[in-house]
């Protein structure tokens, strides 16, 4: 992980621990009047990030977090999802396409439609994990994979 792979942002002091993964939800009404909002809001809404390092123990006041916020380094977190088995090749670079399935009752629906990944994202398959053929209610041949975006 290089310095250019991380961003400095602020996170609630109760949440600030290395390894924490979160989905950045974006600006809240309370943020409009904050002098630190540019640092807080420099992430892409709807994306998954991981806290890599706590930069300082200095707590900054926040209108949203009652215990204040801390400066942290974050990186894009890898995301678990599914791909067609024939496309699941470790190290391959792909353009992400979500599964074409609307079976919300399926046990793997949440994995097939992960939060934080968007159609058309350029990703690298970091790891091919397991076959999900027997779990897919639509009968698709799927593999669970870890993607870096």
From Swiss-Prot:
Disulphide linkage map: none
Source taxon at top rank: Archaea
PANTHER family: UPF0179 PROTEIN MJ1627 (PTHR40699:SF1)
Family: Belongs to the UPF0179 family.
HAMAP family according to UniProt: UPF0179
Protein name: UPF0179 protein MA_3685
């Amino acid at each position: 992980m290089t310095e250019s792979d991380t961003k400095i942002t602020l996170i609630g002091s109760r949440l600030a621990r290395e390894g924490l993964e979160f989905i950045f939800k974006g600006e809240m009404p309370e943020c409009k009047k904050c002098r630190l909002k540019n640092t807080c809001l420099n992430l892409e809404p709807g994306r998954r990030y991981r806290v890599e390092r706590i930069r300082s123990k200095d707590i900054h006041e926040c209108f949203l977090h009652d215990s204040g916020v801390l400066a942290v380094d974050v990186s894009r977190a890898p995301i678990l999802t599914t791909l067609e088995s024939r496309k699941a090749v470790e190290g391959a670079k792909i353009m992400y396409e979500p599964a074409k399935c609307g079976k919300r009752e399926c046990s793997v629906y949440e994995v097939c439609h992960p939060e934080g990944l968007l159609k058309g994202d350029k990703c690298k398959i970091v790891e091919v994990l397991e076959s999900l053929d027997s779990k897919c209610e639509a009968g698709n041949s799927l593999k669970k994979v870890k993607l870096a975006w």
